Amino acid sequence: FGEDEESQALKKAWEDHGGAEYKIIDRGGYKIGLFGVMGEDSVYYTAAGSNTFPDRIEVAKKMVQKLKEEGAQVIVCLSHSGTNKDSSKSEDEILAQKVDGIDVIISGHTHTVLTEPIHKNKTWIVSAGCFGKYLGLLDIDAKTKEKIDYQLIPITAESPVDQTISAKIQEYKTDVNENYLKQYGYTMDQSIGYTNFPLTDVYEDYSAFTGNSMADLITDAYVYASKLTTKDTSFTIGLTAKGIIRSGLVKGDITVGEVYDAVNLGKGNDGLLGYPLIRVYMKGSDLIKVAELDRSVGKDMMVDGQLFFSGMQYHYSDYRFILNHVVDAEVRTNAGFYIPVEKDKLYPVVTNLYIANMLPSVGKKTF
């Protein structure tokens, strides 16, 4: 933990809620050791402030040794590292290969649905996707560590309710309502809007390089909020990225909790949850560079980096070289039609602070 005020508050919360480097639980007559690690890729995307993360391989080796010394018979690693189709880039496979003694790695971060576990260096690597869509079940022999059964059980409206988990969820909701939302006059289940059609969750086809109705709503909302605040009636471009959109909306009432689910990352200097919005002016030539990053990086290299625009569109050719795919870009006027971007003209752009912090790197690109 860092020494600044926020980091120390995080440390206190960690301690108050029973946080620990590792834990041993007794189940079925066996001692099961648990520990967690943070992956390199997830650290890269984390707004960690002054907090630092030690090398996960060294941490894992240390934890395995401690757990064995304290009598753990099965060792489970909760990993926010993830897997990759390319095993040389698959962090949890690398972890299993480099650290002996881990029996199971429950893999997170990449939201991978592993229909069959990966077996590497006597370690079972499992992953049940994201957002509670599946319940993962791995049954192994506690003595031989051989796999007996593995299932991904879909969580649907017909799934039986676990009363213990349901009570815990209600406890958390009451805590959020009383200690956070109440000061703004809201509750988690309060309806604040309605949609007569579903807004698509980007995770329905995360690798697809295509438009998204939820992203359209978010970027349009950015523009609307900007105009309310600045009283500027000129056309404005809204910009966000796939990686910070966390869910869609189903048809019907829109609740406070659902809005938070969709845009729940970050925090502003005022202490409010969510990345604050920022309004900047960008030259047309830089807008074209942003479009190029979207096409070359968001489509071909980093799925999380796909960008979504309100008030701007561009045309590209797949037959051109990387970082040179974009043919032209256009912005939408208040009259609703599109006109070509002028390279030397300044255009108002509203985005969130996370995206804004990445924009300076655009000017360093050469293409």
Located regions from the model:
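Solvent-exposed loop/linker segments at secondary-structure transitions
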Residues: 139-366
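Acidic, metal/ion-coordinating pockets
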Residues: 1-158
